[in-house]
Amino acid sequence: MNLIRAILLLIFLSTPLKANTIYNLIKIPNLEIYEINTKNKLRYFYAARPFQLGTQKNIVCSNPNKKDLELKYKIIHKNLNRYSYDYLKKINLKYIVMCENLSISELYTAGIPDNIMKTLILDIKFNEKYFERVIHHEVFHVMHLQHKNIFNEEEWAKFNNFEFKYAECSTCTKNISLEKYQETNGFFTEYSKSTASEDMAEVYSHMIFLEKKEINQIRKLDPILNNKISYIENKIKEIDNSFTY
């Protein structure tokens, strides 16, 4: 009986111990391990219960159901598996947190990058149509935060037509559509027109997500996007010369 009690006590204590260990790593409560044995050494966690973050507790996300988690993990893993361990290390990304209905100050968002904690929070209930591409959009934000000295927003803005101006912030504009333009004219999507950093992330995500043939065709037809793509290519080489897309 004493042995059985000891085993039951160990099982009872193991779950909060794991949660505490994860919290100490990335300062997000209520997480549990989903997968940690991956080729590129990314660690995947999920929200076992809803959590709130930030000094004002304005970052909120809920726990997903098992079926959604299984489905979306496969999609996330497939897309992030394109990145090598070395590349992820250079952009400072190690932990993926999966939850649903992610919001900041009641504004829903696809993801929240935190290069300091080496973490990317992803909303697995984000719009199905754009979900895969948006994963790479958020990866760029991690890289941008880690290498702000490399990605110069003023230099980037000069690629656009002289009369074009970005908004002050991504939530200060009605340019929110992620639908790819049929005629790009310097921008992949309406959301690209919000801020320089969002434009960079949209260019990067399309570079990764679209077929090479389609990217090459866009480059031939759109000189502004050709310059933007070349810029992203060259800056990534400064971070990891071995990376290909």
Q: Which stretches of residues belong to each language-model region?
A:
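Non-catalytic architectural context of zinc metalloproteases
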Residues: 20-68, 100, 171-181, 197-199, ...
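Classical Sec-dependent N-terminal signal peptides that target proteins to the secretory pathway
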Residues: 1-21
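Generic alpha-helical secondary structure signal
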Residues: 27, 38, 48-50, 55, ...
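Active-site-flanking segments in enzyme catalytic domains
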Residues: 92-245
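Surface-exposed alpha-helical segments enriched in charged/polar residues
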Residues: 15, 74, 78-81, 85, ...
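Auxiliary, metal-adjacent structural segments of Zn-dependent hydrolase domains
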Residues: 54-116
